[in-house]
Amino acid sequence: MNTYVLTAIAVLASLIILLVGRNAIKSSKKKPFQKHLLVFFGSGGHTGEMLNLLNALDDKLYSVRSYVAGSDDTMSVSKASLLSNSLPSVKSKIFKVPRARYVKQSWLTTPFTAFWSLLGSISVIFWNPFGIPDVILCNGPGTCVFICLLGYLAKFLGKNVKIVYVESFARVKSLSLSGKILMPFVDRFLVQWPDLATKYKRAEYIGIVA
């Protein structure tokens, strides 16, 4: 994972300048009181945790949503579709992005898949038909790192994006690599075990959401 993160950091600034620019910061077609929420489904148990979190959200406030999943993650796409159909008052769209790294993938080829994942993430954040999201809600490994870092960069382009990262239920005593990377960049870092909140100052204990 370190390899593709370093690759992302190396090309991120130039990609934003060349492919996005300040013209990407535009008003979306949503009412002033509506918030555009971007949700990343990290597959498997991560998706289950995210669905539980979404059940607690106010549909009226977060009535514009972008659901993002890996391009090969049919389960998460199916779950997102079911959620979208169950909330007719919510305007939503499902996006698929390439995975940053596949299970058991060689580290030698990871920079290449990571690069395509980064490009897909740029499209979801900066060329989204709903506009740049107001809130990004992420959990899970891999691609969510790009999503959150791009949201952080959007702040320097004039968009006040709030980024919330939820650490996995499986992380009881220590943070995941994604969590360690993202902690300095997110607005809220939520954990499901009290020991993590004690160990890391920025971590907020919210209880079990799995």
Curated annotation (Swiss-Prot):
Record-stated family: Belongs to the ALG14 family.
Gene Ontology annotations for the cellular component aspect, listed alphabetically: cytoplasmic side of endoplasmic reticulum membrane; endoplasmic reticulum; nuclear membrane; UDP-N-acetylglucosamine transferase complex
Main location: endoplasmic reticulum
Domain of life assignment: Eukaryota
Subcellular location: Endoplasmic reticulum membrane; Nucleus membrane
A single GO BP: dolichol-linked oligosaccharide biosynthetic process
Record keywords, A-Z: Endoplasmic reticulum, Membrane, Nucleus, Transmembrane, Transmembrane helix
Topological domain spans for side Lumenal: 1-3
Protein name: UDP-N-acetylglucosamine transferase subunit alg14
Residue intervals passing through the bilayer: 4-21
Residue intervals annotated with topology Cytoplasmic: 22-210
A GO MF label: protein-membrane adaptor activity
Keyword Nucleus: yes
A Pfam family: Alg14
InterPro entries xref list: Oligosacch_biosynth_Alg14
Entry annotated with the keyword Translocase: no
Reported function: Involved in protein N-glycosylation. Essential for the second step of the dolichol-linked oligosaccharide pathway. Anchors the catalytic subunit alg13 to the ER.
Membrane topology: Single-pass membrane protein
Quaternary assembly: Heterodimer with alg13 to form a functional enzyme.
